[in-house]
Amino acid sequence: CENFSADITRLDYQLQGADLPKQGIRGEGSLKARWEDLNKRLSISNLNLKANESSLRGGLAVVLNDKPTWQLDLTSDNLNLDTLLVRAPLADENGEDAQTAQAAVLPRPVISGSGELPAWSVLNSSDGSATLQFANLRWRGLAFTNVDARMVNKNGQLSVERLRGDLGAGRISLPGSVDASGTPVHAVFKPEVSNIEIASILKAFDYPLAVSGSLSMNGEFSGDSIDAQAFRRSWQGKASVEMANSRLEGMNFQQLVQRAVTRNNNDVQAQQDYDDATVMAHFSASATL
């Protein structure tokens, strides 16, 4: 049996590739690594990594048995995914942009002769857990703070015990599970949203609706694929929704009603200086997807 340790005090790197941002990824880092031959265990500790505008600290351990078992623990003061990941455009409801979105995803290396492995195959091929804490996280233009996540995978069943963070004056929690032990994959999430500005969410996912206001929501949704297109087309679920101080641009319902009344009654005078928007102090509804 042989054990060895390595202390890497400085590592400079630069990455370029089809699946990376145009400017690439560059940075520096340091870490300690240890291999225990008897236990087939590789551990990385004191990880300190910088990448573009982001930084990561923490460690990783993996036991390389027939079915690897891993443990990941990462923290960050600032993680900007918008400078680390390629953002593909979202297709519209009619699928007119689907070919454009597909073309934006450049080809990846082929894995064996059967093509690329299924997206969730890693959940069946290994077990593990991950704890993530990010003071500042930027994704699709959304600036999250105090992000805290805890995930555990066992035999193809991923439990998202915690996935929460602050966004502006509000808070989002997204616990759930992904069962990849069978076919098709089945995912269930129970979002809890409190006092989130809806305009920023709509903008992040390229929705053209001109709506603003404070959104709160509790619900449960399920589907067989985790992406924006699948959520629009095939996910199902229910939620209770509340909005405060909401504003819908381009349509004034009160003005529409008054115009309808004045057309049928010449004695009624409609106000002419309405803003071209509908404003509601409070709105609540039950929604089904």
Residue ranges and their predicted role:
Residues 211:
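Conserved catalytic/acceptor-binding region of the Class I
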Residues 10-11, 81-85, 198-202, 248-252:
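Outer-membrane beta-barrel proteins
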Residues 45-46, 206-208:
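Beta-strand-rich interaction surfaces with strong enrichment in secreted/lumenal proteins
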Residues 51-54:
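Internal alpha-helical scaffold/solenoid segments in large eukaryotic proteins
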Residues 88-94:
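Terminal amphipathic helices with adjacent charged low-complexity linkers/tails
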Residues 47, 59-61:
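A structural feature that tracks compact, well-ordered secondary-structure segments
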Residues 62, 67-84, 229-231:
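Flexible beta-edge/linker motif
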Residues 2-4, 11-49, 96-192, 214-289:
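Solvent-exposed beta-strand/coil patches in large extracellular/periplasmic or lumenal scaffold regions
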